[in-house]
From Swiss-Prot:
It comes from Neisseria gonorrhoeae (strain ATCC 700825 / FA 1090). This is Histidinol dehydrogenase. Zn(2+) binds at Q259, H262, D361, H420. NAD(+) binds at Y130, Q191, N214. One of its GO terms (molecular function) is NAD binding. The keyword Acetylation does not apply. Its cofactor is Zn(2+). Pathway: Amino-acid biosynthesis; L-histidine biosynthesis; L-histidine from 5-phospho-alpha-D-ribose 1-diphosphate: step 9/9. Binds 1 zinc ion per subunit. One of its GO terms (cellular component) is cytosol. CDD domains: Histidinol_dh. Belongs to the histidinol dehydrogenase family. One of its GO terms (biological process) is L-histidine biosynthetic process. Substrate binds at S237, Q259, H262, H328, D361, E415, H420.
Amino acid sequence: MKKLNTQSPDFQAGLKALLAFETAQNPETERIVADICADVQKRGDAALIEYTNKFDQTNAKSIDDLILTQADLNAAFERIPNDVQTALQTAARRVESYHQRQKMESWSYTDEDGTLLGQQITPLDRVGIYVPGGKAAYPSSVIMNAMPAHVAGVKEIIMVVPTPKGERNDIVLAAAYVAGVTKVFTVGGAQAIAALAYGTETIPQVDKITGPGNAFVAAAKRRVFGVVGIDMVAGPSEILVIADGTTPADWVAMDLFSQAEHDEIAQAILIGTSQAYLDEVEAAMDRLIETMPRRDIIEASLGNRGAMILVKDLNEACEISNYISPEHLELSVENPQEWAKKIRHAGAIFMGRYTGESLGDYCAGPNHVLPTSRTARFSSPLGTYDFQKRSSLIQVSEQGAQKLGETASVLAHGESLTAHARAAEFRMK
């Protein structure tokens, strides 16, 4: 891991280098994705079947072979162990409860001239959620993407999940059952994104696509944005831990590992006010890494993008955190709620030594789909509001038409838009 000290003259340069990440789009990936999207848009189900058989090594004869029914999802739920059933239901219940509190409501008021103004909230009609399949299967992603849509009132939630070599993950399908997914298609990659965006003979066009995926899925989401909405194009996972030395070093070490084990380009950063404590955490990491099944990935991640930063105090730690704008921020300090008030930019803030980031990933309640790559400066976690729309309401009274008409007429003439002005004037006495 890199070692930085805010008192060093080259600290700012070192911090910028630490956060630098090459996000340039791969031209070859973009070309392949463009061809796939165009083909699926043109040939629909036939193209989808061909690409699925090619990339996932399946043997689908027709689109019916790529459809899972509610009975299939229920059967998957029944096959998993009881403790896993309970865990899925507990997580779903907590996520639902949290996202119910995010739900936007319609409102209106009447001004002094009798004109009604307001905002009408409506859910999206149909959404698609992409879930990685095969060995890298994440049932938690199903719950985090589907449950907010369900809470928002989306009538049709369509899930696509690849099944390499026909391998279905029962826990993922059980999560779909628990989270209220309407339909499931066993397709993945750019071809699945294209099918959701443009529609095929069998897969209906959706209004928005959410969910994580590989580079081809990310490129496809970028390409279809505008035809449909998307949640975000997420970068590598990140964690930043601010520690005052009161949390056991082993706990912090494992929290850093929890993000580093995602992949070799994930980023784990520890900010501390004591060099002795940073050394203690480093020693814990050296000891605990021996027990990690994904040791190679963790070591590569920490070596590539990990860091320990020594600061003079917690105020400085918060300033640096706001600059980094991490996906996950752990405030492993005393009085965490007070320090949280100093945080302006973070996807999720985990307060106190008992609030491990992994609890938020799975079952605390808030969404684990979070902005990465410093985008927390201007964006937010996935939520119920992402599956709702706002429409403005205006009902002008006869009296209001006189006052507003005069104002609108003057402004319209100022813009040389005569029809606009006349439309307002016709309603004036």
